[in-house]
Amino acid sequence: MELPTRIRIDTQSVESRTIVEVESEDRLGLLHRISNVLTRHDLNIHVARISTEKGAAIDTFYVRTKSGGKPTDENKLDELKRELETELG
């Protein structure tokens, strides 16, 4: 059974970081692909919670910009979401 990829970006729950949550079918190289997209968007991962169960991956990343700020630009975050969906789709 194929699990659809879902991306959720939350700028409200944590004051100093943006949360990027990825739900997807678990597969070889998934974390590598996600981290490459985050890097291309000049984001640093400060905390990652990685969970897999029965072929599903739920990976949550708390990110900041390379300059240490909280990513909040909606256009850039929409672009990040689209690229993650394309990369993992």
Name these PLM-found stretches:
Residues M1-G89:
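A conserved regulatory-domain signal marking ACT and ACT-like small-molecule sensing domains
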